[in-house]
Amino acid sequence: MNRELPDVQAAFRKGRGARDQIANICWIIKKTREFQKNIHFCFIDYAKAVDCVDHNKLWKILQEMGIPGHLICLLRNLCEGQEATVRTEHGTTDWFQIEKGVLQGCILSPCLYNLLAECIMQNSSLDEAQAGIKIVSINNLRYADGTTLMTESKELKSLLMKEESEKVGSRLNIQKMKITAHGPITSWQIDGGTVETVADFIFLGSKITADGDLLLGRKL
């Protein structure tokens, strides 16, 4: 499974982690300023990302990525037919079937979600998009379900993976998405919601300034 993932995905992978992505984004900001380039970021957030994975679409994605059929069958048997009950102050609910999402606490779940996220990115044709950063051949950084889109132009909105995300059961959480721009940009309206534009931003638990400086004092 790891072979299907690009270098920009750093979550749940040996030798990669949040600190690498934080260092990468700080370096990108500083380099664009050094070369006097504009830089625009959009921090994508999904609503209940791991809980909304459509099982049937996940099996199809794994098949298209070349995962052997017997392994897909094992994963299907593991995920399907699961039941849960909710404990409340008034007692417990009736048992109900879990029809979506990857299993909480399962060591395979992060890998499965990474593959789903990779499918969204591939189908969004980001590699073919003209937007991106020219001093480095990159237009996104990823950590699990957290995706950061980046470009030198104002056409950041053209990189959004909204349609492809919805095809696999994931919905953009407009209220938690943020834009930061080192250059002119107007606010976005998506599905009736406004994406907030900010100067400093929280990236993987660390606050990064508009100059690309990392403010210590926040814990990862």
Where are these regions (language model features)?
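Nucleotidyl polymerases of mobile genetic elements and RNA viruses
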Residues: 1-220
